[in-house]
A protein has these predicted regions:
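Glycosyltransferase catalytic domains, chiefly GT-A lineage
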Residues: 1-145
């Protein structure tokens, strides 16, 4: 997205990462971003839920090698957030609760961790003046064969 001066606007990319499968999906997401969009200048933020009463276990990324790979090799920033409403009972709610950990005046794009980046993101016309969410609500899951 171009800003008013005609230059590309910096934005962050946000995914939720936590213990288990989402750790490794976050690593693959970050690796695909760095490979396919090496000129991306924004921050890659891994939003990580913290332990608390809504989690019967510690949801943080517990694989230290993966954590090191994300932060030191792939340049991600891990930011924590508290689960106040969803937690383990509805882990998809982490996407909503992760928003509280973001800087309010900084534009961002939220991706699911099971996404692979296949090309430069500066070709996508994100409009940060008109926030939106995916409108794909039906027929987005494969039909069982």
């Amino acid at each position: 997205m171009m800003d008013h001066s005609g230059t590309r606007e910096l934005f962050d990319i946000v995914v939720v990462g936590q213990a288990g499968r989402l750790t490794y999906e976050a690593v693959l997401f970050a690796a695909s971003l760095r490979h396919a969009a090496p000129d991306f200048k924004g921050r890659l933020i891994i939003a990580e839920p913290q332990p608390g009463p809504l989690w019967p276990f510690d949801p943080r990324i517990d694989d230290q090698e993966a954590r090191h790979l994300l932060t030191d090799r792939l340049g991600a920033k891990i930011v924590s957030f508290d689960s106040r409403h969803f937690g383990a009972a509805y882990p998809y709610g982490n996407k909503v609760e992760a928003l509280a950990a973001l800087e309010p005046d900084r534009p961002f794009v939220f991706f699911d961790t099971d996404t692979l980046i296949t090309g430069p993101l500066d070709a996508v016309a994100f409009d940060f003046n008109r926030p939106s969410a995916s409108m794909a609500r039906e027929a987005t899951w494969p039909e069982p064969q």
